[in-house]
Amino acid sequence: MIISPQSLDTNLSQLLAEVKSGSMQLPEFQRDWTWDDSRLRGIIASLSQGYPMGAIMRLQYGNPDIQFKYRTITGVKGVSVKPEHLILDGQQRLTSIYQATSSKEPVSTKTEKGKAIKRYYYLSMEKCLDDDEDRFDAVLSIPEDRKIKENFDRDVKLDLSTREYEYENKL
């Protein structure tokens, strides 16, 4: 029996819920997640403008004749269920979006030069509403302590360590 591919429009929040629950996972043979800070900011900027994230290819899991080992995407914690689908293409995008928007932990990523960093991502509401601003510049990459410092880390330029500070700074 030949199974033809299907094209489905699935909203992003549903895809992220499937990732979080473990119903959508990766086949073990997939490479690890590798996106750097700049690419993360880029996809957040694109999605915030309503651009599509591109196609996600996935395989329905469960055929007894074809069994792959599987694993959750990077950042998903405490899930040990059998998946309904395996992600064949789109892992980098889904992992990036999941970690930046749905995980409570900072994203473990790297700079463009390869230095390991941990970041939280915010949208500057003021910059998002300004038509003259590049949306990429509206996506802020904040260190794991949620503070931007200057003067050799002596002075705090921006503090987002509490919800109140986030709201106060319109992020």
Predicted regions and their residues:
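Basic- and aromatic-enriched surface patches that contact anionic nucleotides/nucleic acids
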Residues: 2-37, 41-171
